[in-house]
C-alpha cells in the first residue's frame, strides 16, 4: 500500500499559564454529595474504549495485563481478556470490528522489552500481534478503517486488514523506562494521548517526556500529517478531546485550532501529568474538564516577566467543570468522587461520560443532570442600599432553586456581623430574606461586599457565593449606582453611537450599554480572560485583547457581528491594544522564549500581527503587564509599564520616539490627550514624557482618569470599602473633589493598570466602574449647592415651639432639599429626596421635604436638650439646638368645613363633623380631639411606624381636658390606629359646662398645654 504525504510542517507554538487569580468571594465551599459512580478495578487503568454497539466499555488494565470488559447497562465487570503485558492504550474501529491494543513494555535490562500491538477482531474473537519496534504510546482509528500508532520515536500508520505499518514521521525519543517508581499512575509512565474526531476525519495527539513534547494532527483524507512542536508553560496535560468535525481540539487545558493557535486556555492552570481530563461535546457547545489550578496570586503588584511553570497538588475536592466550548466560560462545577487520571470518553449522544479515575472508571451521566440535586441562586448579587439616615433593617429576597426542578436541601450563610438570613436552610425552591442592619456598617460610607455561601448535603454541584453589596452613603455622596455582577476590568465610551462598553472578565464578554438610559443593550462574547478593549481609528470596530488567548476578537460596532479574529505570533497573548492614525499596536505577553512582553504590529486587513523587530532604536522588550492607550487625535500611543518605563509611539514618524524611566514604579489610571499631555498614576507627563506635575495623594489610590480637552476627570479611593472621590484636575491642581456613592475599582496584583472612567461625548454624564458595577455621575456633579440651614423647629399641628418625643414636627430653614417630595410610604423613610435629619444622631422619619420646610416625626426615644443636623447634597448644616419636652400637646389646625379652612380638628361624635359656630358643643356630647406631641405610649410604638389597633397605645402621661374650666371625662388618650405621630383624645362633656361663643377648650399634659375657643350651647 502506497501513501502520499503532501507536506510536513513544524511550527514553534508556545503556550503559557494564565495569570488571572480567582476572586476570593468565588472560593469553592466544602462539598458533601458527589456526581458519578465509581467502578473500581483490581489494577491500574491506563485507557478505555467505548463499544456502544455492544454496550461495553473496554478498560486497559496496565498492571494486571488484561482488558476488563464493563457493561454500560449496569456498570458491572462482565469479563476480562488476558493480553500481552502492559496494555497501555486502546482504540476501537468505527465499524466496531477491531479493538487495537498498544503494549508499552519498555523495560530495561535484564528484563525483556516487549513493544507490540494486539489486534482483536470483536466479531470472531480472533487475535493478532504486531511488533512495533519502539514502545507504542497510543493508538487511534480513523473513519477509513486505518489506525494511527504513536511510538516513542514517531508516528506509524497501521492497516488492520493487511497488518502493514508505514512510518509517517520521527521525532526525539519520548519514552520512559520501566520499572517505574512506586505509586505511579500509568498516565505518568506513558504521558501521551490521541483522539479522533467524531466524523473520523482527524486525529489530534500529544506525547511528552521530561525534555521533549510532540503535538500532531493527522487528516485521514489524503493522509496529511501536521507535526507541530510546542513549548508550553505550563506543560499541557496529556489529554485530548476533539470537535466532531475535527476543526479544533482540546489538548489538556488548551483549546487549539488545526494550526495549534491557542484560541483559549483554562485560566490559572498548572502543570499536571497525572490529574485531569477533558471531553468535548461540540454539538452541544460543551467541554467537560478537570483542570488543576494554582492558588490566587497575591504577593506581586505586576505580572512577572517570566512565568513559572507551577505544579499544583490535587484539588480537594476534585471537581468537573462544565465549560462553554468557545471560550471556556464555566457554566457549572460538579463534585467528583475522585480525580480523573486518564482518558474521558463521551457517548455519541453526549449523555454519558466515562473517565479513568483513581480507582478505575467513573461513570458520569451528564445527560441526566436534571435528575441530580443541584443548587443555583436567582441572582449573583444582592444589593442593600442604606444611608447615614436610614438605619432601618434592609431586607432583600433571594431565591434558591434546583435547576432541574427538584427538592434539594440547602444552607446559606454569612460570617458578617449585621447580616441575617431567614431561613438559613431549607428545601428548594425557596425564597430567603437577606436582612442587613445598617448600624453594623455605620463606619462605612462606601460599599462592602459580603459573600453569602451556599452549601448542601445532597447537591452535586458547587454554586458560587452570592455577593451581598451593602452601601451606606451620606446624602452629599454623588452618583447613581448600577449593579453589574462579575469582575469588571475595563470601560470604553463610544462617542459615535452614544454607548459605552464594559469588559466582564469572569464571564468572558463585553457588556454594551445605552449612553442615555444606562441600560444594557446586548453582550458580546470574547475569548478567555479578556483584559482590554480598543476601537479602530475609524471607530467602526471593537477589538478585545486577552490574557489567555493568542487572538484578539473583532466586532463590527454597527451590527454587533463578530468578525475574523486577529491572530498573533506563536506565544503572544495580546493583553492591550491601541490604534493611532496609521498603526494598530498590541502589547503582548510573550512566552516564546520565556521572556518579557513584546509590541506587535497588526495588519488589520489580513487580521495578523507581527512582532516589531525593534521599537525604533530601542529593543522590543517590554513588561508584559504594561498597557497601551492612544491619543484621541491618533497622533500617538502611550506605553506605560509597572516597572516605571514609559514609551511613546509617534504616528507621524511611524516609530517609537521616546523611552524613559524617571519613576521606580507605576500603577493605576493611564490616559493620553490630543494636546501632548499624558497621565499615568498620579503623574502628569509632557510631550517628552517628562513628569511635570504630581496630583494629590491625600484622597487615596488613583483609579480612573480621562482627559477632556486639556483638563480631565479623576477618581480615587483610600480603600474599596470607602467612598470614592471624583475631581476635575489639570496639571497642577485638583478642583472640587466630590465624594462618590462608592469606591471606584482599584488596581490589583494582576491588573496594575486600570481604566475605570468614561466621560460620555455629549457631556451628559461620566461613567465610573465601581465596586457594585458602575456609577453614573452627572456632568455637573460638582455644581455649587449651598449648604443647608436650620432656622426653627416647631410642632406640625399649630406651629408652636414645644415639641415632644413621637410628635410630628415642622423644620424650617434654607436649602433643605433640592426637590419637593412627599411620601405615603410606611414605615416612614429616614431619607427623602437626598435629605435626612438627625436628632442626637438618631434619624428622623420624614413625611415631606422642600427647599424651606421638612415635616417629620421626632424619634420616640429622644428627650431633653437636643441637637438637630440636616444632611443634603449641599453638605451638612450647622448644629441646631432645641429642647424636647416629655409632652407638648398641640391640636391640628387642618380641618375644613365648607368655605372655612384651618379649623381645629375637634369633632362631635353625634354627627362626626368638626366643631364650628354652626356645629357647637352640647352638654353630654362626646368629642374627639386630634393632636400631636403627647409623648410616650404604652405599649410603645417605634419611630416611623403606624400605631396598632390592638392593643391600643395609650399615652403614658394622661392629659387633662377642660371646657370653660370644667374637667371633661377622658375616655381614651393615645395614638390613632394606622397613623404615625397622630394622637386622639376622646372625652365626654358634662352637663354643667358654661355656654358661650368663646369657651376655652384646654388640653394640658405634663405642664404644657394648648387651648382654643369653641361655642357651647344647651
Language model feature labels by segment:
Residues 71-75, 121-125, 159-163, 219-223, ...:
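Short loop/turn segments that connect beta-strands within beta-propeller blades
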Amino acid at each position: 500500500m502506497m501513501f502520499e504525504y503532501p507536506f510536513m510542517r513544524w511550527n514553534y507554538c508556545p503556550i503559557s499559564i494564565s495569570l488571572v487569580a480567582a476572586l476570593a468571594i468565588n472560593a469553592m465551599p466544602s462539598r458533601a454529595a458527589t456526581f458519578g459512580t465509581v467502578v473500581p478495578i483490581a489494577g491500574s487503568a491506563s485507557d478505555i474504549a467505548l463499544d456502544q454497539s455492544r454496550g461495553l466499555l473496554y478498560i486497559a488494565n496496565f498492571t494486571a495485563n488484561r482488558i476488563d470488559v464493563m457493561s454500560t447497562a449496569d456498570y458491572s465487570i462482565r469479563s476480562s481478556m488476558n493480553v500481552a503485558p502492559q496494555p497501555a492504550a486502546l482504540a476501537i474501529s468505527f465499524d466496531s470490528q477491531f479493538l487495537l491494543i498498544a503494549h508499552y513494555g519498555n523495560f530495561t535490562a535484564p528484563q525483556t522489552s516487549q513493544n507490540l500491538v494486539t489486534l482483536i477482531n470483536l466479531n470472531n474473537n480472533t487475535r493478532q500481534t504486531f511488533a512495533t519496534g519502539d514502545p507504542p504510546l497510543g493508538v487511534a482509528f480513523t473513519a477509513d478503517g486505518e489506525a494511527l500508532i504513536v511510538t516513542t520515536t514517531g508516528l506509524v500508520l497501521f492497516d488492520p486488514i493487511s497488518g502493514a505499518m508505514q512510518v509517517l514521521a520521527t521525532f526525539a525519543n519520548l519514552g520512559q523506562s520501566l520499572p517505574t517508581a512506586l505509586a505511579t499512575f500509568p498516565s505518568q509512565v506513558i504521558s501521551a494521548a490521541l483522539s479522533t474526531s467524531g466524523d473520523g476525519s482527524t486525529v489530534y495527539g500529544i506525547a511528552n517526556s521530561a525534555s521533549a513534547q510532540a503535538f500532531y494532527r493527522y487528516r485521514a483524507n489524503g493522509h496529511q500529517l501536521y507535526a507541530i512542536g510546542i513549548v508550553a508553560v505550563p506543560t499541557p496535560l496529556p489529554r485530548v478531546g476533539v470537535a466532531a468535525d475535527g476543526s479544533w481540539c482540546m489538548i489538556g487545558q488548551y483549546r487549539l485550532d488545526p494550526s495549534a493557535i491557542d484560541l483559549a486556555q483554562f485560566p490559572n492552570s498548572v502543570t499536571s501529568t497525572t490529574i485531569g481530563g477533558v471531553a468535548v461535546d461540540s454539538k452541544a457547545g460543551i467541554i467537560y474538564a478537570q483542570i488543576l489550578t494554582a492558588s490566587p496570586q497575591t504577593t506581586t503588584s505586576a505580572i512577572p516577566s517570566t512565568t513559572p511553570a507551577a505544579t499544583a497538588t490535587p484539588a480537594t475536592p476534585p471537581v468537573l467543570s462544565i465549560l462553554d466550548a468557545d471560550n471556556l466560560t464555566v457554566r457549572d462545577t460538579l463534585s467528583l468522587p475522585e480525580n480523573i487520571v486518564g482518558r474521558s470518553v463521551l457517548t455519541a449522544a453526549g449523555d454519558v461520560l466515562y473517565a479513568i479515575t483513581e480507582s478505575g472508571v467513573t461513570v458520569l451521566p451528564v445527560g441526566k443532570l436534571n435528575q441530580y440535586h443541584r443548587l443555583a441562586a436567582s441572582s449573583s448579587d444582592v444589593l442593600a442600599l442604606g444611608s447615614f439616615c436610614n438605619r432601618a433593617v434592609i431586607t432583600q429576597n433571594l431565591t434558591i432553586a434546583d435547576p432541574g426542578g427538584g427538592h434539594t436541601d440547602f444552607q446559606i450563610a454569612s460570617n458578617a456581623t449585621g447580616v441575617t438570613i431567614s431561613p438559613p436552610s431549607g428545601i428548594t425552591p425557596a425564597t430567603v430574606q437577606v436582612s442587613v442592619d445598617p448600624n453594623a456598617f455605620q463606619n462605612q460610607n462606601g460599599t462592602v461586599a459580603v459573600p453569602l455561601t451556599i452549601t448542601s448535603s445532597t447537591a452535586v454541584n458547587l454554586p458560587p457565593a452570592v455577593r451581598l453589596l451593602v452601601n451606606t452613603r451620606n446624602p452629599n455622596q454623588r452618583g447613581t449606582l448600577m449593579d453589574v455582577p462579575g469582575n469588571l476590568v475595563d470601560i470604553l465610551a463610544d462617542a459615535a453611537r452614544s454607548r459605552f462598553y464594559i469588559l466582564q472578565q469572569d464571564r468572558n464578554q463585553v457588556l454594551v450599554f445605552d449612553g442615555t438610559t444606562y441600560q444594557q443593550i446586548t453582550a458580546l462574547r470574547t475569548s478567555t480572560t479578556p483584559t482590554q478593549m480598543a476601537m479602530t481609528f475609524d471607530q467602526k470596530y471593537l477589538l478585545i485583547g486577552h490574557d489567555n488567548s493568542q487572538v484578539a476578537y473583532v466586532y463590527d460596532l454597527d451590527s454587533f457581528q463578530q468578525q475574523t479574529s486577529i491572530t498573533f505570533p506563536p506565544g503572544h497573548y495580546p493583553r492591550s491594544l491601541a490604534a493611532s492614525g496609521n498603526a494598530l499596536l498590541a502589547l503582548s505577553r510573550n512566552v516564546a522564549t520565556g521572556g518579557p512582553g513584546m509590541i506587535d504590529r497588526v495588519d488589520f486587513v489580513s487580521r495578523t500581527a507581527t512582532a516589531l523587530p525593534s521599537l525604533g532604536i530601542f529593543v522590543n522588550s517590554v513588561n508584559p503587564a504594561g498597557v497601551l492607550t492612544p491619543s484621541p487625535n491618533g497622533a500617538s500611543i502611550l506605553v506605560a509599564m509597572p516597572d516605571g518605563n514609559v514609551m511613546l509611539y509617534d504616528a507621524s514618524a511611524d516609530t517609537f520616539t521616546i523611552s524613559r524611566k524617571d519613576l521606580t514604579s507605576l500603577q493605576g489610571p493611564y490616559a493620553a490627550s490630543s494636546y501632548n499631555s499624558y497621565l499615568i498614576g498620579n503623574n502628569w507627563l509632557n510631550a517628552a514624557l517628562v513628569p511635570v506635575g504630581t496630583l494629590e495623594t491625600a484622597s487615596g489610590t488613583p483609579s480612573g482618569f480621562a482627559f477632556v480637552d486639556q483638563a480631565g476627570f479623576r477618581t480615587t479611593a483610600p480603600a474599596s470599602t470607602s467612598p470614592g472621590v471624583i475631581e476635575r484636575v489639570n496639571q497642577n491642581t485638583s478642583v472640587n473633589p466630590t465624594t462618590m456613592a462608592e469606591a471606584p475599582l482599584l488596581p490589583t496584583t494582576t491588573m496594575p493598570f486600570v481604566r475605570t472612567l468614561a466621560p460620555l461625548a455629549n457631556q451628559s454624564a461620566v461613567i465610573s466602574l465601581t465596586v457594585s458595577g458602575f456609577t453614573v455621575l452627572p456632568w455637573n456633579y460638582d455644581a455649587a449647592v449651598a449648604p443647608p440651614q436650620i432656622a426653627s423647629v416647631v410642632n406640625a399641628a399649630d406651629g408652636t415651639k414645644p415639641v415632644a418625643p413621637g410628635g410630628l414636627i415642622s423644620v424650617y430653614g434654607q436649602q433643605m432639599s433640592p426637590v419637593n417630595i412627599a411620601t405615603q410610604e410606611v414605615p416612614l423613610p429616614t431619607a427623602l429626596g437626598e435629605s435626612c435629619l438627625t436628632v442626637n444622631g438618631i434619624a428622623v422619619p420624614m413625611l415631606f421635604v422642600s427647599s424651606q420646610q421638612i415635616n417629620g416625626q421626632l424619634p420616640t426615644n429622644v428627650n431633653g436638650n437636643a441637637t438637630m443636623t440636616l444632611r443634603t447634597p449641599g453638605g451638612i448644616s450647622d448644629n441646631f439646638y432645641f429642647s424636647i419636652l416629655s409632652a407638648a400637646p398641640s391640636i391640628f389646625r387642618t380641618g375644613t368645613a365648607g368655605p372655612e379652612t384651618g379649623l381645629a380638628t375637634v369633632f362631635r361624635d353625634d354627627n362626626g363633623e368638626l366643631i364650628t359656630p354652626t356645629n357647637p358643643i352640647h352638654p353630654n356630647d362626646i368629642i374627639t380631639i386630634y393632636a400631636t406631641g403627647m409623648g410616650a405610649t404604652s405599649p410603645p410604638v417605634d419611630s416611623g411606624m403606624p400605631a396598632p389597633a390592638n392593643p391600643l397605645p395609650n399615652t403614658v402621661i394622661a392629659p387633662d381636658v377642660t371646657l370653660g374650666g370644667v374637667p371633661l371625662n377622658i375616655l381614651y388618650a393615645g395614638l390613632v390606629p394606622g397613623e404615625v405621630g397622630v394622637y386622639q383624645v376622646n372625652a365626654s362633656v358634662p352637663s354643667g359646662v358654661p355656654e358661650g361663643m368663646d369657651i376655652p377648650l384646654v388640653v394640658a399634659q405634663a405642664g404644657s398645654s394648648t387651648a382654643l375657643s369653641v361655642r357651647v350651647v344647651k
